[in-house]
């Protein structure tokens, strides 16, 4: 016979409610014991009946388990609190950063001449002063770059002049010094002339007087 599904609501009959409590309590205590043994779990179970009677089970010392639970929840709450504070700080920093960006964009548009129709004379004078300061910095940087480039060109010119002087000095010391290839070619020409002379001397038969 199939057991009917029990509706999950308070049992109105006191006797039936007490019988159900006893059965479910014993089953719950048994399951808690099995869980602690099979899974080596630290487990504590506290039950108060409707009349205020205490039923409890603990795989170890009940007080130690409660202290461990309190410490865990306290640390967890502290960690959550710190996280909330850090998150709030990040939100404030992001809000300040957005405000700064908007202010910079506003000043940028003013410096570009956008939206200045509503500016007062003092505001326009301040914008003009900022532009003059910016223009002065640009010119100063431009002059510095020109100076650095000129110094590099002068250094390059000095290097080329020194190399030219060294080459001139070498030519003065050895004005007739040629390359090794030219010297070898001249040597071979002399040898060839000598060979031609010697060949001319031995060609032909000696003259005999008849």
Swiss-Prot record:
GO terms classed as biological process: abscission; cell differentiation; floral organ senescence; leaf senescence; positive regulation of transcription by RNA polymerase II; regulation of flower development
Cellular compartment(s): Nucleus
Gene Ontology terms, MF aspect: DNA-binding transcription factor activity; protein dimerization activity; RNA polymerase II transcription regulatory region sequence-specific DNA binding
A GO cellular component annotation in the UniProt record: nucleus
Positions of the K-box domain: 87-177
UniProt keyword annotations, A-Z: Developmental protein, Differentiation, DNA-binding, Flowering, Nucleus, Transcription, Transcription regulation
Entry-linked InterPro entries: MADS-box/MEF2_TF, MEF2-like_N, TF_Kbox, TF_MADSbox, TF_MADSbox_sf
Recorded phenotype for the gene knockout or disruption: No visible phenotype under normal growth conditions.
Tissues in which the protein is found: Expressed in quiescent center (QC) cells of root tips. Expressed at the base of the petiole of cotyledons and leaves, in flower buds, petals, sepals and abscission zone of flowers and siliques.
A Pfam family recorded for this sequence: K-box
MADS-box domain: residues covered: 1-61
Keyword Nucleus: yes
Main location: nucleus
Biological role: MADS-box transcription factor that acts with AGL71 and AGL72 in the control of flowering time. Promotes flowering at the shoot apical and axillary meristems. Seems to act through a gibberellin-dependent pathway. Interacts genetically with SOC1 and its expression is directly regulated by SOC1. Plays a role in controlling flower organ senescence and abscission by repressing ethylene responses and regulating the expression of BOP2 and IDA.
Further facts: Plants over-expressing AGL42 have a significant delay of leaf and flower senescence and a deficiency in flower abscission.
Name used for this protein in its record: MADS-box protein AGL42
Organism: Arabidopsis thaliana (Mouse-ear cress)
Gene (UniProt): AGL42
